[in-house]
């Protein structure tokens, strides 16, 4: 107690001995620092709003002339299919790359029917197999085309949220092989031509799972975090060549991967989401602190801003809340599986 009293007396004496002028200077400095912090945060938010709702992105035509090609991986369903359709509408020829040949043929016919002036090519390859022969075929196709746009959409997630210790090895391997290695290998085949032509656009589908550590989707979350770092690094490397690289940060979208069918303010359908991506190229949207990245869909952008600029993404509270949400999803998925199993047994 005497120790505390002694030091409080010293503090009191220091305060009393501090000259009034210095007190004013100190208070002014604190006020200025606080005001600067508040103003900077406000300006960031204004920038986010302008990026999401007002300012246009780069025109797609700036990446290549009419009749140049767009390569879309994971093209047969969902986002990939919608990217292909909207790029075809913008007069790009389309190289469709995905696993199922019949789905690719169906989409190819749909594109040429809707847009008669657009050419299509298809390549059926399973990115999970990581076969050199498939990438050799892709290289042969790419080398003979003027590829202006690459959409790295191919991806895989867990069948349901699962603790890492219980994740099947084949599922874990497929996620890393498809999301990471497949994206890298496809990009490495396309980029040299873009560098030679001094133009191009490389879009890679990211995820909030790459921003937020996601318990029970640990491997998927890690793969998307890898893509975030890789794409940002690639963006800096290719910018001097006139190539725009952008990782698209997305929350939930109605798709086969998300297993969500109903849209809402925070869960758009593929058409709305892809439109926001293609009309906001070069704008960060809700991700002002991430170079060469964007959260272009308005509600996703506001969520990304709040997470990255207000709450932070790596804190224990945020991670715990994310864990709780996915534990709940897992419980519902397991109950649904049990009900379906019961129906089959009867």
Swiss-Prot record:
Domain of life: Eukaryota
Binding-site positions, NADP(+): 71, 126, 134, 153, 220, 224, 253, 255
Principal EC category: oxidoreductase
Membrane-spanning residues: 26-46
Protein topology in the membrane: Single-pass membrane protein
Listed GO MF terms: ketoreductase activity; very-long-chain 3-oxoacyl-CoA reductase activity
Keywords: Endoplasmic reticulum, Fatty acid biosynthesis, Fatty acid metabolism, Lipid biosynthesis, Lipid metabolism, Membrane, NADP, Oxidoreductase, Transmembrane, Transmembrane helix
GO BP terms in the entry: fatty acid elongation; secondary metabolite biosynthetic process; sphingolipid biosynthetic process; very long-chain fatty acid biosynthetic process
Active site: 220, 224
Keyword set includes Signal: no
Catalyses which reaction(s): a very-long-chain (3R)-3-hydroxyacyl-CoA + NADP(+) = a very-long-chain 3-oxoacyl-CoA + NADPH + H(+)
EC assignment: 1.1.1.330
CDD domains: 17beta-HSD1_like_SDR_c
Gene Ontology CC terms: endoplasmic reticulum membrane
Recorded metabolic or biological pathway in which this protein acts: Lipid metabolism; fatty acid biosynthesis
Compartments where located: Endoplasmic reticulum membrane
Family matches, as Pfam families: adh_short (PF00106)
Keyword Membrane tagged: yes
Family membership noted in the UniProt record: Belongs to the short-chain dehydrogenases/reductases (SDR) family.
Function statement: Component of the microsomal membrane bound fatty acid elongation system, which produces the 26-carbon very long-chain fatty acids (VLCFA) from palmitate. Catalyzes the reduction of the 3-ketoacyl-CoA intermediate that is formed in each cycle of fatty acid elongation. VLCFAs serve as precursors for ceramide and sphingolipids.
Protein name: Very-long-chain 3-oxoacyl-CoA reductase
Organism: Aspergillus niger (strain ATCC MYA-4892 / CBS 513.88 / FGSC A1513)
């Amino acid at each position: 107690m005497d120790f505390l009293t002694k030091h409080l007396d010293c503090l009191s004496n220091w305060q009393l001995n501090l000259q009034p002028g210095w007190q004013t200077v100190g208070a002014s400095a604190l006020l200025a620092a606080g005001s600067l912090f508040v103003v900077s945060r406000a300006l960031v938010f204004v920038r986010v709003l302008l990026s999401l709702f007002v300012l246009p992105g780069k025109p797609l035509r700036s990446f290549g002339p009419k009749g140049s090609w767009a390569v879309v991986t994971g093209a047969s369903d969902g986002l990939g299919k919608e990217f292909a359709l909207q790029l075809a509408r913008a007069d790009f020829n389309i190289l469709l790359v995905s696993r199922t040949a019949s789905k690719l043929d169906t989409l190819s016919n749909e594109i040429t029917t809707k847009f008669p002036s657009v050419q299509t090519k298809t390549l059926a390859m399973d990115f999970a197999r990581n076969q050199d022969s498939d990438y050799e075929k892709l290289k042969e196709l790419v080398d003979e085309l003027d590829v202006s746009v690459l959409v790295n959409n191919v991806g895989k997630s867990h069948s349901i949220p699962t603790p890492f210790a219980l994740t099947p090895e084949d599922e874990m391997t497929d996620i890393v092989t498809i999301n990471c290695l497949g994206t890298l290998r496809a990009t490495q085949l396309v980029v040299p031509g873009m560098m030679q032509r001094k133009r191009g656009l490389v879009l890679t589908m990211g995820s909030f799972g790459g921003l937020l550590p996601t318990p029970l989707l640990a491997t998927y979350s890690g793969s998307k975090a890898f893509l975030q770092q890789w794409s940002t690094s690639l963006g800096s490397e290719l910018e001097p060549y006139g190539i725009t690289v952008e990782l698209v940060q997305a929350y939930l979208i109605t798709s086969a991967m998300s297993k969500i069918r109903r849209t809402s303010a925070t869960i758009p359908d593929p058409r709305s989401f892809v439109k926001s991506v293609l009309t906001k190229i070069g704008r960060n949207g809700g991700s002002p602190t991430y170079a060469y990245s964007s959260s272009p869909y308005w509600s996703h952008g506001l969520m990304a801003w709040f997470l990255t600029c207000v709450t932070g993404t790596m804190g224990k509270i945020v991670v715990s809340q994310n864990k709780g949400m996915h534990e709940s999803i897992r419980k519902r998925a397991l109950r649904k599986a049990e009900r379906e199993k019961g129906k089959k047994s009867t």
